[in-house]
Amino acid sequence: MPKHGLDRDLVRMANQISRQFTYVSDDEAAVKVAYHLHAFWEPRMVAGLEAHAAERPADFEPIVLAATRILAEQYGEASAAH
Amino acid sequence: MTLIREQDFGTKARPGPATVHVQVDGRNVDVPEGTSIMRAAATAGIDIPKLCATDSLDAFGSCRLCVVEVDGRRGTPASCTTPCSDGMSVKTQTEKVQRLRSGVMELYFSDHPQDCLSGGGHGCELHDLADTVGLTEVRYGQPETSHQDAAKDVSNPYFAFDAAKCIVCSRCVRACDEVQGTFALTIAGRGFDSRVSAGQDQPFLDSECVSCGACVQACPTDALQEKTLIQLGPPNRSVLTTCAYCGVGCSFKAEMQGDTVVNMVPYKNGGANEGHSCVKGRFAWGYASHKDRITKPMVRDTIEDPWREVSWDEAIAYTATRFQQIAAQYGASAIGGITSSRCTNEEVYLVQKMVRAAFGTNNVDTCARVCHSPTGYGLKTTFGTSAGTQDFASVAKADVIVVIGANPTDGHPVFASRMKRRLRQGAKLIVIDPRRIDLVRSPHIEASHHLQLLPGTNVAVINAMAHVVVTEGLMDQAFVDERCEDVAEWAAFIARPENSPEAMEPITSVPAAELRAAARLYATAPNAAIYYGLGVTEHSQGSTMVMGMANLAMATGNIGREGVGVSPLRGQNNVQGSCDMGSFPHELSGYRHVSDPTVRELFADLWGAPIHPEPGLRIPNMLSSAIDGTFRGIYIQGEDLAQSDPNTQHVTAALMAMDLVVVQDLFLNETAKYAHVFLPGTSFLEKDGTFTNAERRINRVRPVMKPVTGKQEWEVVVEISAAMGYHMAYANESEIMDEIAALTPTFAGVSFKKLDELGSIQWPCNDAAPNGTRTMHVDGFVRGKGHFVETAYVPTDERTNRKFPLLLTTGRILSQYNVGAQTRRTKNNTWHPEDVLDIHPSDAEMRGIHDGDWVSLASRVGETTLKAKLSERMPPGVVYTTFHHPVTGANVVTTEFSDWATNCPEYKVTAVQVTPAPTTRPLIMHQVPLESTLVEVGAASAISASGVSASGAGASGAHASAVRTEAADPRA
């Protein structure tokens, strides 16, 4: 479908971001991805990503899943404050 | 009321350390060595008569009017071609000289329309000089042969050439050569038969002339004259302002009769353009008074209703009330705004302030999202500041110039003229572009290397170039050791075999040997400069590529002085400014993240409103959220998303899903079809404020007339905010800039007063740089050390396949501008009345397509129809089109893929198929799951906007998606 909601964007965008950090270890990449999402993604996008990852983790690269865990652990308070 | 007339010194300045002392008519004057007598005299306040000389051109010495006598020298040398020597004494008004001048003028007038002798056109130097030399009669009588019956050439829509008035001084020819660099004119014939010839003795319109107007400006008679000047007569006042087209930001004198613009003359002291311009800025300003201009606010409850003109009070109250209702029901995060890169800094600043303080959200973005947002990300990450490093004049010191993903002769023509001048002087050129742009080979210019890469492989190429630099020992080790960090990690990464030119060749299609040669040329040049455009940024790795270029520049020490650098050719007149003003969901003005509590406190204190600490939605996220139902109201200032943003069907579906779409613009555009409120905006001729160009140069925009809408745009924003309960108070635009300066360290020293004093200011302008900053990162990077980033090449997800085997890339053309809202409403349609599809002859032949045939251009998201133009400028497998005409709808086929860091759309890489179209009239069809409906543009159609909204919103699966494509009056 040419038109689409945010959810489809989130999967595509998150996976795309994760593929940019192949030059570091997966752990480091997850940290970088988490930072990027926290710095540039609006809270409903982060929340949508976390919800989708919890429900359908197979849609995401492993680095994205690791990044969502870091997001919740390190930035969770800030996200919840929105 | 006065006309601004810049002094013409007759010949160019010759800056240099040595000085000579001369005396002209008894006045002592010191000038740099090499200065002409003419210029020295002008410096001393003495104007020597001249016709063939002007200080934008090299001296020519043909008219013989400027002859003088020099003590101790024989004869009467031309003062324009004679340099001063130390101790020289010059006489400019001896009896002998006056006699010679009078004789020369008499000869000129012997073959010149007699009416010029007693009256003349505006600024006719020949007429003025006749008075100066005291010429009152021509004794030659009517010669047997003359040029008085010479035909006029009125082919150009903007200026006329009357050969009868031409004195063959060659100023026009030299202006076309030296200033513009097109070489479209010559002097044909010899002796009495000499005549100005365009092209191969063709009408101007049929020749290579690009209608920049440099010849018109250079002409000392009325031979070349603007048609508006002929029609309206001479102006009587000038207003200095700035062009509203591209990111060059040319300064102009708007020359007026009352409130009527007669002509726009490039301002010689304009920092960006120094007296030059292009066809758009100089001539295509008529859109400001076009009949399509909307001057009254309009509202409607639904987009199916006709528009209703209302008062400003009603429109503002309606807008404010609706935003408040939506926010109350769905939360402040359900509303937001988009600012324009065509509006002033002051206007943009206030819209983002309204969104943050009155709406209570960071859901504000700007059109830089779809063009140079990767520049902001990439240069901030590597250098520490989201802007280019140089000014335009810097190119004059470059020894090697790299142009990547840009076509400056079309997109930034005045800067291109500077670049071409440097190339003609011997600088080398490397072009990295899938298309053979004009710069690859044009008069007196040929690229040393054209790396004709496949679309989507920029990072592979730049990494391969950097690989050469590192592995062949071409790094400027002293520079990187002193000024940069993370060098070793980056060098180890880039040296890997997979980054070599040989490994990348199958991916990029660039021969390894060619790439190695180009890399060596760049790395070994004393000064090497990179200029780039949207062919870099509008990719899935746009930000990565910007960082890759920054890596290359740092690795070779090409940062921090003139002649080097990394310079984005920013598209719009104020896209730099709209970014500077914090019109981003994650940043406040000066590129400071909203999460920084110190910055938020600064704004909150001055604004009296809290700033949200989390980033807001970007434009693509706003649209997707609208389809989800979580984003429901939008304020769109001067942007036409429905034409300019990718995947048109997605955009229009999102707009239709919203409860409130407010459009502030000059004309009803594609986006306005989906709007509930239309607030008429002001053109640049009515605005009072500033634009910031690609050089970080803040220029004044001064009004030549009152707003035809009755209000300045910023006043409307202030009133909407007030109606929503947030009050702002400014007496004028200068006070808005004062607030910007108070809050933004890079603007701290900027004020309207200082801009009037200095003419323009390049930020940063603060205590450390009170007059602004020409070149960035001179002694150190803004972030401290330059940061090397490992830029792994990741192929785009957009792939060709059997169904879509070609790659589409898009771009601009000289005569039209962006979505064409302005230029389509001028005579520039003469040159580009429609978008066409450039296709390689071999691709066309395989498909049975001939030049001029209608073709269907289809991608996985949509299809459109346009005419084919066979061209070898692209390699086989790549097609190209522009996006200036809504009827073509080029963005119907572009996809949702975007830059990983910024969501800048990947306009430059779309997998498509091209097939002969079964019809002879243009069609736009959106791809649908089960059935398709063709809608003929211009034909009566039973499908209305209501049909679109009913079928387009909500339902998934089978539905007919028929889109009204004709820009019919929605008020009908």
Where are the language model's segments positioned?
Chain A
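C-terminal structural segments of small proteins and small subunits
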Residues: E55, F60-H82
